């Protein structure tokens, strides 16, 4: 039985963010780690419920790692929590809380067992490479979800309590990724065509490779094992290829795009808890919610290129450069893209939901009987 709503199969988690519920005092901590982040520093302070009916609490933390346990990854994250509450009398109180955690972190990519064997480690991460001697990761996540909740507690009498909350959140989540057009070779070192096994079918034990195939295999094998840089992304080459394309007046060959999945969410919920008698308790509630999901790509880095046209480069070979089918935006054909511009796709998904529920709990001696019903749409 949950006094705030109907639980799912896995149960429910309810976090009390009322400032008056935090013990007065101060706390600071420093934590070390050897996984995603190296260290975390954190401070929390609370006033408790003061004589004037106010209560305040706040917390701030920072986590970071120049490089995690996986090579080429880094972690940089701050977090905050602020809450205030005013208790007007024994019947009414109003609380507000806001929190968020702006984070930037580099990712690891999965690879085949062949790539792990060639690299000599299952910690091998093909997402990074050297750019002018410094490590750069192609898959970097930026996330931030500033959130706000306002709660009104109304103790109607000894038997009934009404809790009404408004919640708002703007979720900003994006991850970068390498992109290339149909005239460029796949730059990923662990792409199957860049592995030694692409020389011939090495998995067929009954197949005898030709001299040329065997020489190709050994050349690829030596390339992979001779230098760590050879099994990572080659940023310097991608910049060079784009510079050559610039000189010829051509299109960008390699770039870094950023894929966004943002959400704007608002929820309003109200629950009435009723003690009918010593054996029976009930909860009736109404929940209203709306979410706008925004999905789009932006140009993160042109890698030195001067020109990028917003068309589907891989469809050009099937339909031709002048076909409408290759246009990502038919309202703005052949639009030139600069850093920060939206391109590729841009669409919204809107979800509106309303739920009305009732749940009842009967408790006597060793017996607990619980039932609920809800309607939503």
Predicted feature locations:
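Acidic/polar loop-and-plug regions of large Gram-negative outer-membrane beta-barrel proteins
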Residues: 85, 93-151, 174-257, 321-339
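Membrane-embedded beta-strand positions of outer-membrane beta-barrel proteins
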Residues: 26-30, 56-60, 96-98, 164-166, ...
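Transmembrane beta-strands of outer-membrane beta-barrel pores
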Residues: 30-36, 62-66, 100-104, 168-172, ...
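Transmembrane beta-barrel wall of Gram-negative outer-membrane proteins
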Residues: 33-65, 69-108, 140, 146-156
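Outer-envelope beta-barrel architecture signal
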Residues: 22-26, 39, 50-56, 90-94, ...
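Outer-membrane beta-barrel transmembrane strands
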Residues: 132-177, 251-287, 293-295, 339-370, ...
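A beta-strand signature from Gram-negative outer-membrane beta-barrel systems
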Residues: 1-29
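Small-side-chain secondary-structure face that scaffolds active or pore-lining regions
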Residues: 189-206, 257-261, 293-312
């Amino acid at each position: 039985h949950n006094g705030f709503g109907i639980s799912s199969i896995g149960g429910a988690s309810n976090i009390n963010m009322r400032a008056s519920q935090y013990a007065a005092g101060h706390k600071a901590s420093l934590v070390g780690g050897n996984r995603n982040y190296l260290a975390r520093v954190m401070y929390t302070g609370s006033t408790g419920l003061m004589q004037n009916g106010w209560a305040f609490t706040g917390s701030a933390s920072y986590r970071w790692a120049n490089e995690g346990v996986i090579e080429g990854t880094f972690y940089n994250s701050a977090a905050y929590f602020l809450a205030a509450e005013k208790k007007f009398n024994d019947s009414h109180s109003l609380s507000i809380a806001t929190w968020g955690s702006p984070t930037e972190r580099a990712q690891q990519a999965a690879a085949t067992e062949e790539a792990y064997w060639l690299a000599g480690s299952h910690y091998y991460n093909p997402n990074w490479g050297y750019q002018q001697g410094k490590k750069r990761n192609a898959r970097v996540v930026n996330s931030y979800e500033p959130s706000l909740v306002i709660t009104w507690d109304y103790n109607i009498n000894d038997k009934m309590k009404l809790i009404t909350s408004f919640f708002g959140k703007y979720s900003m989540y994006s991850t970068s990724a390498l992109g290339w057009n149909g005239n460029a070779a796949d730059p990923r070192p662990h792409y199957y065509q860049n592995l030694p096994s692409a020389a011939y079918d090495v998995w067929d034990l009954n197949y005898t490779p030709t001299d040329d195939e065997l020489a190709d295999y050994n050349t690829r094998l030596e390339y992979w094992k001779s230098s760590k840089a050879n099994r990572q992304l080659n940023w310097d080459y991608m910049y060079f290829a784009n510079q050559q394309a610039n000189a010829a007046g051509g299109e960008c060959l390699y770039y870094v795009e950023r894929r966004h999945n943002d959400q704007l969410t608002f929820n309003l919920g109200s629950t009435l808890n009723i003690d009918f008698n010593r054996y029976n308790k009930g909860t009736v509630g109404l929940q209203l919610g709306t979410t706008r999901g925004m999905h789009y790509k932006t140009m993160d880095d042109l890698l030195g290129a001067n020109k990028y046209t917003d068309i589907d480069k891989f469809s050009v070979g099937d339909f031709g450069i002048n076909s409408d089918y290759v246009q990502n935006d038919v309202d703005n054909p052949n639009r030139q893209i600069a850093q920060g511009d939206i391109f590729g796709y841009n669409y919204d998904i809107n979800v509106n939901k309303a739920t009305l529920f009732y749940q009842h709990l009967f408790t006597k001696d060793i017996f607990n009987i619980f039932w609920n019903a809800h309607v939503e749409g």
